[in-house]
Structures are given as structure tokens and as C-alpha cells.
């Protein structure tokens, strides 16, 4: 007989996989072991015990053996003796029945009756139990054996266990306990900032990733102290870094598909179907396991008898085992149905770390999907602590804090130079994103002109910043930077531009008001009315050299501090994010303004206060709610106005007074509802750029030929059917945007535009292109924006010239 301990082999998987087994899989595995025991026990008994014991029947009625002669006599007044040639004698007392059969005949009868008359369910019951149990085990463990899933599971478990046991995770939890049990007292704010000023230079980064956020009072205190505990050694740090890389690659690989989820779902469905099948036929056939079996076989010529009464010795035990087996299958099936319900009820292909993000400092922990999410859901059924610890290695903030342990060694000068880029202003800039601090090697980049610090909490600018003699621009995006006195003295004399992006107004460092040489200030964040009191600070009024002020916020009116510094401003830009801006009379005080941008301020009319700003050269009223611009007549007093941007509004028509703006060089009226262009517009003879795209125009007036200085014309996405010949008198045209109209043809006079470098024709009803396009000497194939089949209508020599021009440029 097989030892019970050997049966565990069929149910046990690799020990490491136990964390992927929810409680229902554990239950079903143990139930399967019990089922195997039933099968082995029943099969062993069937092999070792007598299968059937049969005796001939002397009294037979209708092929049925009567229990006694009296029963036979009562049922048959004229008895017959079909099963024997011997006449029965009256029962005169208890006498035995003797048969003249030998042992071999009995064995033969037992075998024949067992094979032919015993019901198949009673005969094969142990083997059926064994077969069904093996199928259950195969379904439960197939995903651990199938190569496409087992490889992912093995890799996942390996990484998960390493992350769980990583010193980085352990020290992070220890740091959390320290922070909770030993908060800094509130009164140490002043002492900490004064007595430890020198220690804040090149502040050591925390060695651990705290699992809980610091208390609000600690953040408000702004204490910067040196962490002396929890520093990983180099080997542990490298191991943790390698884990981060493994997690990234594994996540990228596993999130591509959902084969693990689908296979687990299918094997669960198969088990439910199998359960229903077993219950249906087992309950139906279990009553066929009987102790007494009548056996009628045609072997009278061999034994002298035709009917036998047989006993099935294992019937009672098999019926008990069958009942127990049915109860186990029912329990097994209920667990499988619960598993299926769990999988259908929950979105298992998405896993959110929202709770961990809320209770920790890892607000950037990404949600995962597909097989990665499903495996994490299974892990949560085993122990949610695994996924919480694993989440540390999904956070970029956590990774950056780990790097900070050896920041100066990792961020070598050569590595930082590789991150240097040229911005749009052709300045050399370095962007540091989500680090734990500023590497000391940054201050060896003496050629650096722009330094961007984004999402760097609790950073302290050290005195060594004075080495960056070329630094003129600093960006602080969600970075409440502290600064030491020598560093502030350097920035006060050298910094020219400062960009600050914040969520809370308190993130704006107070030391910026000491930057007396500052010329540009960009503020992006919440500056609503209830927060205005925070920015009415006398220090900002000391920025006497401020020339450019950009505000991207949700103001209801201009803060007083803006008005105070506006006397010497040259450029003011307000992007109000769709909030209505009222009370603009204070603009009159900004007499030195040359550029004014009021973007997304929900303006319905052009503010009258603008008309008194006689130095204005550019006005941008993008994305407001302008429906009429009758006030444009007052722009004639702005003699220096060269650029007017009224785009992304709801303007229905252009007033004829626009012709008074004779100095206008650029006019943006795209994304409006204009249906007609007044002739007076073409009195603006200095126009070089005219954008009327995305309107409702149906034609271009012939007077457009008056714009002899026009270099760029855009009428994309209108309903223009034809181009006036006068358009091609604008010989200085370099770009002509005509896409998405209803043009039927392109005039051959297009060849007269000898300065044309770009023409857009896509989305029209053109059937062919004029050959005269080849007469535009500066036009290249890349500058001809048109459908490929339409381009093919050009003669080969024209196409060849356009292609050749592109190649020559390359």
C-alpha cells in the first residue's frame, strides 16, 4: 500500500509558490489529498479482498432468486424447478443446503458474475475517484507547469522575496518607526535654522524611504538635519539598485499580456464544470452500490446452475466512501465557485496602490495591470505586507532616494555633462528631476546657465553654487528650496530669471524677495483670492529690476503686489486657466509695458485700460470669450503695436476700423467664427503674418493683393472654393496654408511666388497640381504638403526637382 506521505507529491508545488496560493487553493489541495486517500484505500481493498462471493440459487422465480422455499411456494402454487433436476422435499426442520460444486467452479462463477452483473459504478468507483482527483490536481497546478506562465511566476516570486528581504525595505520601515516615535519639538524651529546653518550645506540625504509621510508640523518647521543612521553599505545599495532595475524590466514584460490571468480563469472554470459533472452522475449512480446481487448467466452447462445470489463484500464500505467523496466534491465545488465569483466580481487585471500612496510618501507609485496586477491580487490573499513592501520598488521617488545614499559617487561630472542640453534660447541647462538632493558635482559645471530642480523635496542650496559663475536662470518646480546665506548672496548678484511652480503658495521660498537683480519672474500655481494675502509682501516690491512677470493661476483680480511691481515691467503675462479676470483698471499704471498677454481670462470685451498703454508692441488675448472686438478702434492710439493675437475666441466679424492699425505686422485671428474679411483689413500694408485658419470663410477678397509684404498666410480649415488671382501678387509669400478647404483647382499663377518654401493643400478637392509649382525655386518636396496620389499628377521632371531639392538640403 502507498504511504500517505507519498501522496503529498501530487498536491505539493514548489515551496516558493506557496505565496501565490490563496486560501481556497490550499483548501482544495488538501481536499485533493483526502480524495487520493479514498481512491488508494478503495483500490487497495478491491485488489486485496474478495470482489464477489456467489452461491447457486435453488428456488428461482422469473429469473429472481427467492430467499426461501416458503417464499417460492407462496408465490407459485404449481412449482417448477428451472435451476435443478432434483425435486424439493417438504421442510421437516432446519437442514443445510448442499451443492455439488468444487472450488474452481465457485471461482469461475464469482469472476463471471463480477464481470457481467456487477454495476460499473460499483466496480470502478476507486478508479473514478482517482481519475477525477488527478484531473483536479492537474487543473490546480497546470499554471505552475505551463512554460509561458511558470516562467513569469518563478521570476515574480524570486523578485518578490528579494524585495521583501531587502535591507532597503527593512531600513525604510525602521526609519518610519523612528520618525513616529521621536518627532522634533516645534520650538526647535528657530534654533535648528540658526545653530545648524552650516550643517545644511550639502545635506546628507535620508538613507531610507519613509513608509509614512512626515507630520505637517515637521514640514512647516523646515528642519534640515543630518541622518546618521540607516545608511546602507555599498553592497546593499548596489543590490537594492539592481532590484529596481529587475522590477522595471519585469513590469514591462509582464504587463504586456494577461496569459496568467486567463489560464487561471480557465482552469477554475474547468474545475467548476468538472464538479457539476461529478455530482450529477455520482449522486445518480451511488444507489447501484449494493451488497446483494442476483446473477443470471448462461453457464448451466458448466456448473449445473443458471441463477446465483452474489454478495459484494465491499459494497457497504464503498457506499460510505462514496458518500464521503460526494461531500468532499461538494465542498470542493463550492470553493471553486467562490473562486470564480471572486474573479468575476473584482477587476483583477488592475491593481491600485492608492492606499499605499495615501499612507506613504510615494505618491508616484503607479497602478499596474494585466498579469502583474493579477499576481499582486493573489499575493494580497496570502499576506498584503508583500505587496506593500514590493511597492517601494515601483516608486521612482524611492529609487531616487536610494541613489542619494551614494549620490556624489554615482553622479560623476561626466554623467552630468551628458544630461546638459540646449534650450530654446540656446542656453546650456541641466534638469534634475525627482532626486533627493543636488549632487556636489553639479557645481563643477561652471558653464551651466540654467538649472532646473523639479520635485526635489527638502533641498538645500549650498554655498558651492557660487562656482557656477554662468548661472543666470533657476527653475524650482514643486521644490521648496532652502538656501544658505553665502549661496543667497551669490544669487542676489547673479540670478536674472526665476521660474517657480507650486501647489500651495507656501512653497514659494521667502528668500526670492532678496534677489534684487532679478529681471524675470514666472509663477505657476494657486494664486486665488483667499491666498492673495500671502503674496502681498513688501519684499517683492524691492525687485526694482524686474522686467518680465508671468503668472499662470486662477486670479479673480490682479494682486496688489503685481500692480506695485508693474511700474517698471516691460512684459506681463497672465494665464488664468479659464477663471474670469475682472478689475483690470490697475493695468493703466504699467506704462512701460511693451508686451501684454491675457490668456484664458474669460474676457468678453477688450479691456479699456489697455488703450492707455502707449508703449505696447504686442497684445495676446488668446482663448478668451471675445465675441466682438469693436474696441479695436482704440488700438489706433497704440502707434507701436505690431502684433495682435485674438485667436481661439468666438469673434464673428472683423470691424472695418482694423484698417487704422497701419503698423500691424502680425495678426492672429485663427480659431474664431469669422465669415467675411473686410476690405479695410488690407490697408494694413505692413502685415507679414496673417492667420485666419479654422474660421467660416468662403472666399478671399481680391484686395488681398495689396499686402505686398505678406510672407505667411494661413486659411486652413475654412470653406474657400477658389483663390483670387490677386493673391499671387504677394510676391514675398513664403508659406501658404490652404489645407482642409474645398478648392477645386490651384491657379497656375502659383509659379509667380518665387519665395514660396511651403504650401499646404491637403484635404481639398483638387484633381491635379499645376506644373507651374516647379517654377517656385525655393519649394522642396517636404514643403509641399499634399496627398501622395495628388503629388503623382505632377510631371516627372517637376517631382524630380522637388525631391532633389530635399536631398540637397539634407
Curated annotation (Swiss-Prot):
Tissue expression from the record: Ubiquitously expressed. High levels detected in the bone marrow; lower levels found in peripheral blood cells. Highly expressed in pancreatic beta cells.
Disulphide bond pairs: 54-310, 57-65, 113-295
Site feature (Required for anion selectivity) residues: 103
Cellular component per GO, a single term: monoatomic ion channel complex
The reaction(s) this protein catalyses: chloride(in) = chloride(out); iodide(out) = iodide(in); taurine(out) = taurine(in); L-aspartate(out) = L-aspartate(in)
Post-translational modification: N-glycosylated.
Consequence of gene loss (knockout): Increased prenatal and postnatal mortality, growth retardation, and multiple tissue abnormalities. B-cell development is slightly impaired, without affecting B-cell function. Mice however show a cell-autonomous early block in thymocyte development and impairs peripheral T-cell expansion and function. Conditional deletion in germ cells leads to abnormal sperm and male infertility: the cytoplasm of late spermatids appears swollen, preventing reduction of the cytoplasm during further development into spermatozoa.
Residue ranges of the motif Di-leucine motif: 706-707
Cell location: Cell membrane; Lysosome membrane
Major site of localization recorded for this protein: membrane
Positions bearing Phosphothreonine: 200, 215
Known regulation of activity: Inhibited by (4-[(2-butyl-6,7-dichloro-2-cyclopentyl-2,3-dihydro-1-oxo-1H-inden-5-yl)oxy]butanoic acid), which plugs the channel like a cork in a bottle by binding in the extracellular selectivity filter and sterically occluding ion conduction. Lipids may block conduction in closed heterohexameric channels.
Coiled coil: none
Domain of life of the source: Eukaryota
Name used for this protein in its record: Volume-regulated anion channel subunit LRRC8A
Organism the protein comes from: Mus musculus
Amino acid at each position: 500500500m502507498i504511504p500517505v506521505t507519498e501522496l503529498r507529491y501530487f498536491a505539493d508545488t514548489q515551496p516558493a509558490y506557496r505565496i501565490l496560493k490563496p486560501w481556497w487553493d490550499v483548501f482544495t489541495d488538501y481536499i485533493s489529498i483526502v480524495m487520493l486517500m479514498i481512491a488508494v484505500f478503495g483500490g487497495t481493498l478491491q485488489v486485496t479482498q474478495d470482489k464477489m462471493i456467489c452461491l447457486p440459487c435453488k428456488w428461482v422465480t422469473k429469473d429472481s432468486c427467492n430467499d426461501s422455499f416458503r417464499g417460492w411456494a407462496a408465490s407459485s402454487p404449481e412449482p417448477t424447478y428451472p435451476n435443478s433436476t432434483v425435486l424439493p422435499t417438504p421442510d421437516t426442520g432446519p437442514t443445510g443446503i448442499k451443492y455439488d460444486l468444487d472450488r474452481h467452479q465457485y471461482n469461475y462463477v464469482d469472476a463471471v458474475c463480477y464481470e457481467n452483473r456487477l454495476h460499473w459504478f460499483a466496480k470502478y468507483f476507486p478508479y473514478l475517484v482517482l481519475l477525477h482527483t488527478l484531473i483536479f490536481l492537474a487543473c490546480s497546478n497546470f499554471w505552475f507547469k505551463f512554460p509561458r506562465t511558470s516562467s513569469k511566476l518563478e521570476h515574480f516570486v524570486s523578485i518578490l522575496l528579494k524585495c521583501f528581504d531587502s535591507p532597503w525595505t527593512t531600513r525604510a520601515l525602521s526609519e518610519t518607526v523612528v520618525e513616529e516615535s521621536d518627532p522634533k519639538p516645534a520650538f526647535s524651529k528657530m534654533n535648528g535654522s540658526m545653530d545648524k546653518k552650516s550643517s545644511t550645506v550639502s545635506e546628507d540625504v535620508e538613507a531610507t524611504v519613509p513608509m509614512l509621510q512626515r507630520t505637517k508640523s515637521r514640514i512647516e518647521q523646515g528642519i534640515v538635519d543630518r541622518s546618521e543612521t540607516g545608511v546602507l553599505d555599498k553592497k546593499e545599495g548596489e543590490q537594492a539598485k539592481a532590484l529596481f532595475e529587475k522590477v522595471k524590466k519585469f513590469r514591462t514584460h509582464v504587463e504586456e499580456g494577461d496569459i496568467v490571468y486567463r489560464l487561471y480563469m480557465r482552469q477554475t472554470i474547468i474545475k467548476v464544470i468538472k464538479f457539476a459533472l461529478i455530482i450529477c452522475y455520482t449522486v445518480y449512480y451511488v444507489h447501484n452500490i449494493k451488497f446483494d446481487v442476483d446473477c443470471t448467466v448462461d453457464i448451466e452447462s458448466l456448473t449445473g446452475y443458471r441463477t446465483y445470489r452474489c454478495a459484494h463484500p465491499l459494497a457497504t464500505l464503498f457506499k460510505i466512501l462514496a458518500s464521503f467523496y460526494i461531500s468532499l466534491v461538494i465542498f470542493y465545488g463550492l470553493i471553486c465557485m467562490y473562486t470564480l465569483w471572486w474573479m468575476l466580481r473584482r477587476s483583477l487585471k488592475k491593481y491600485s496602490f492608492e492606499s499605499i500612496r495615501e499612507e506613504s510618501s510615494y505618491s508616484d507609485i503607479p497602478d499596474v495591470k494585466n498579469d502583474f496586477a493579477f499576481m499582486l491580487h493573489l499575493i494580497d490573499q496570502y499576506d498584503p505586507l508583500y505587496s506593500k513592501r514590493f511597492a517601494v520598488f515601483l516608486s521612482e521617488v524611492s529609487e531616487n532616494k536610494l541613489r542619494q545614499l551614494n549620490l556624489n559617487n554615482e553622479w560623476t561630472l561626466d554623467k552630468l555633462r551628458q544630461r546638459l542640453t540646449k534650450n530654446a534660447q540656446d542656453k546650456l541647462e541641466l534638469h534634475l528631476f525627482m532626486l533627493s538632493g543636488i549632487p556636489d558635482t553639479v557645481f563643477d559645471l561652471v558653464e551651466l546657465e540654467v538649472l532646473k530642480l523639479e520635485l526635489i523635496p527638502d533641498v538645500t542650496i549650498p554655498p558651492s553654487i557660487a562656482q557656477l559663475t554662468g548661472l543666470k536662470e533657476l527653475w524650482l518646480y514643486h521644490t521648496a528650496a532652502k538656501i544658505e546665506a553665502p549661496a543667497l548672496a551669490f544669487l542676489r548678484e547673479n540670478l536674472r530669471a526665476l521660474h517657480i511652480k507650486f501647489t500651495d503658495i507656501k512653497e514659494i521660498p521667502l528668500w526670492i524677495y532678496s534677489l534684487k537683480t532679478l529681471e524675470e519672474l514666472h509663477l505657476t500655481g494657486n494664486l486665488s483670492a483667499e491666498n492673495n494675502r500671502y503674496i502681498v509682501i513688501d519684499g517683492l516690491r524691492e525687485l526694482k529690476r524686474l522686467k518680465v512677470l508671468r503668472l499662470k493661476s486662477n486670479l479673480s483680480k490682479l494682486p496688489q503686489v503685481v500692480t506695485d511691481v508693474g511700474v517698471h515691467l516691460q512684459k506681463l503675462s497672465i494665464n488664468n486657466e479659464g477663471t474670469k479676470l475682472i478689475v483690470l483698471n490697475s493695468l493703466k499704471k504699467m506704462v512701460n509695458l511693451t508686451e501684454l498677454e491675457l490668456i484664458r481670462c474669460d474676457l468678453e470685451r477688450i479691456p479699456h485700460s489697455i488703450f492707455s498703454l502707449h508703449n505696447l508692441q504686442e497684445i495676446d488675448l488668446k482663448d478668451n470669450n471675445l465675441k466682438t472686438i469693436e474696441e479695436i478702434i482704440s488700438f489706433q492710439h497704440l502707434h507701436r503695436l505690431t502684433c495682435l493675437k485674438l485667436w481661439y475666441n468666438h469673434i464673428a466679424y472683423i470691424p472695418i476700423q482694423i484698417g487704422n492699425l497701419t503698423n500691424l505686422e502680425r495678426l492672429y485671428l485663427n480659431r474664431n467664427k469669422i465669415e467675411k474679411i473686410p476690405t479695410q483689413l488690407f490697408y494694413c500694408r505692413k502685415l507679414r503674418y496673417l492667420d485666419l485658419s479654422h474660421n467660416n470663410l468662403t472666399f478671399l477678397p481680391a484686395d488681398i493683393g495689396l499686402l505686398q509684404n505678406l510672407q505667411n498666410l494661413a486659411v486652413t480649415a475654412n470653406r474657400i472654393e477658389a483663390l483670387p488671382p490677386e493673391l499671387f501678387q504677394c510676391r514675398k509669400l513664403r508659406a501658404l496654408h490652404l489645407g482642409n478647404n474645398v478648392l477645386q483647382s490651384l491657379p497656375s499663377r502659383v509659379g509667380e511666388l518665387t519665395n514660396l518654401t511651403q504650401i499646404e493643400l491637403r484635404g481639398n478637392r483638387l484633381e491635379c497640381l499645376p506644373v507651374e509649382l516647379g517654377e517656385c525655386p525655393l519649394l522642396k518636396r517636404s514643403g509641399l504638403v499634399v496627398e501622395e496620389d495628388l503629388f503623382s499628377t505632377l510631371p516627372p521632371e517637376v517631382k524630380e526637382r522637388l525631391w532633389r531639392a530635399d536631398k540637397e538640403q539634407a
